[in-house]
From Swiss-Prot:
It comes from the Bacteria. PROSITE patterns: RIBOSOMAL_L29. Pfam families: Ribosomal_L29. GO terms for biological process: translation. GO terms for cellular component: cytosolic large ribosomal subunit. NCBIfam families: L29. Disulfide bonds: none annotated. This is Large ribosomal subunit protein uL29. Belongs to the universal ribosomal protein uL29 family. Gene3D superfamilies: 1.10.287.310. Keywords: Ribonucleoprotein, Ribosomal protein. InterPro entries: Ribosomal_protein_uL29, Ribosomal_uL29, Ribosomal_uL29_CS, Ribosomal_uL29_sf. The gene is rpmC. GO terms for molecular function: structural constituent of ribosome.
């Protein structure tokens, strides 16, 4: 799981790329879970939280840019 400080240091474009990668990984993990091939169930939670952190950072930056 990415540290929040590491995510804050990234640019908006880098965050967008990271979000895409996390969503892709979440999709793959969901399929692995459905087929019973998931080796690390905790990874699902980590990915979900990282996605939430990225979206929160993007929303904060958007709000501060409009002020």
């Amino acid at each position: 799981m990415a540290k929040i400080d590491d995510l804050k240091a990234k640019s908006d474009d880098q965050l967008a790329v990271e979000l895409g990668e996390m969503k892709r990984e979440q999709f793959n993990l969901r399929f692995q879970s459905a087929t019973g091939q998931l080796e690390k169930p905790a990874r699902v939670r980590e990915v979900r939280r990282t996605i939430a952190q990225i979206k929160t950072l993007q929303a904060e930056r958007q709000r501060s840019a409009t002020k």
